[in-house]
């Protein structure tokens, strides 16, 4: 009986201690000084035991601007969030340069001050102009070690408007 009461108490504690965090992020992506148009920008909530959770997603407009708002729930703490960008501006060579475009992933940790408790953001994290050709990723926790050992890379079909890289 005592074990059942203890188990139920622990389950209720995890539900009661669940915390919600909200954020608003905006900025402009540039690639070599030119607005990076039509690129996906996402905000994720960092999870320790499971895959990170998508909070919000947007695509840059004709001037490279994006604006993301969203909230996420964590079981025990105010959620830690980060901006995630597939950085095709900092192109990496690929075995199929005429058909594939590859680039490093970019993670930018949001300061705790810009993740408000509750479902509504209280302030905006303004990234201003982010020059992707020189941007570097920020990793949290054990991911720092993983990033040191192996770099995350994303690939996509080369857009028809983008010429293949010059032969080197």
Regions found by a protein language model. Give the residues of each.
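Beta-strand-rich domain onsets/edges
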Residues: 2-35, 52, 135-168
């Amino acid at each position: 009986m005592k074990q059942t009461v203890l188990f139920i108490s622990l389950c209720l504690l995890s539900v009661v201690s669940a915390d919600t965090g909200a954020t608003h992020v905006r900025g402009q992506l540039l690639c070599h000084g030119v607005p990076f148009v039509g690129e996906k920008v996402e905000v994720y909530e960092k999870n320790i035991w499971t895959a990170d959770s998508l909070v919000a997603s947007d695509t840059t407009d004709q001037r490279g601007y994006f604006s993301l708002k969203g909230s996420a729930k964590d079981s025990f703490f105010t959620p830690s969030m980060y901006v995630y960008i597939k950085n095709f501006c900092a192109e990496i060579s690929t075995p199929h340069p005429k058909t594939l475009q590859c680039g490093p992933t970019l993670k930018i940790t949001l300061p705790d001050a810009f993740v408000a408790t509750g479902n509504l953001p209280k302030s905006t994290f303004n990234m201003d102009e982010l020059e992707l050709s020189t941007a570097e990723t920020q990793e949290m926790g054990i991911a720092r070690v993983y990033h040191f050992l192996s770099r995350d890379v994303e690939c996509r079909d080369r857009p028809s408007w983008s010429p293949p890289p010059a032969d080197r």
